[in-house]
Amino acid sequence: ISACLVGSEMCIRDSLTGTPKIKAVKEEEKVAATKEGVLQFETGTMTKEELEAILDTLPVDITFVDKEDSVKYFSKAEKRVFVRTKAIIGRKVQLCHPQKSVHIVNRILDSFKTGKKDVAEFWIQVKDRLIHIRYFAVRDKNGKYLGTMEVSQDITDIKKIEGEKRLLDWKD
């Protein structure tokens, strides 16, 4: 077995027969799949519906802010740490924070945009819960800044974990 290129796609070729073992996906097939609602990623495919369900199932809140500092997306998990409404879509992220913290928001965004930093994290007490908030610079393959992703998670119960749990203990 050897690696080969078909067009710009990688495939595996049987060294005895020379026939491809894995069919390379042609560009036209990728376009057709996208038109049918299938999203093509470097590591696989899924539908928009599947992706949205995955993002909403994650045990974290996700908010994405684009390179122009506008809120573009938030996950709508059932138990969000911080409530969001669709009214924030398109709004400058600075307008979504208390005035006294806007200078911190700008410092994080500026550091991400210039490439000085890629992560900022905080943890805060909200009532009796410990909330972990992380900001990540989102970059393309060439390192170009695309925006910022905020990930918030209630870690109160996670902090209580001790030892190991190796077996399923569901009560039927």
Task: List each language-model region with its residue ranges.
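Sensory modules in modular signal-transduction proteins
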Residues: 36-69, 74
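Terminal output helix/cap of sensory domains in signal transduction proteins
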Residues: 96-127
